[in-house]
Amino acid sequence: MIYKDFFEDTIELTDERWQHIIKEHPELKPYKERIIEVLLKPDYVKRSTRDSEVLLYYKFYGDIFLGKPMLVVVKKGLRSFVLTCYITDVIKKGVTLWERK
């Protein structure tokens, strides 16, 4: 599936990556549509400290996962795609590219 992110860039979520996400993080299976929402309406976007071509999109949901943020990890490039998605306890270090005020 092809989506647009907050920056109007095209992001792909392949079937292979979706299968990886639900295998490693089965609690996310009912929340595929939230991945799209995180990309479009993030609370934070950070650049990874490990890979400058990786962006970290965070969104807090009060109604699921005890308010912990959902993190969608995207590899940017000629073909940008979702690497993974999971629930996290912390906002990782890195340059903040955007923050909801």
Residue map of PLM features:
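Ribonuclease/tRNase effector modules and their secretory precursors
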Residues: 1-101
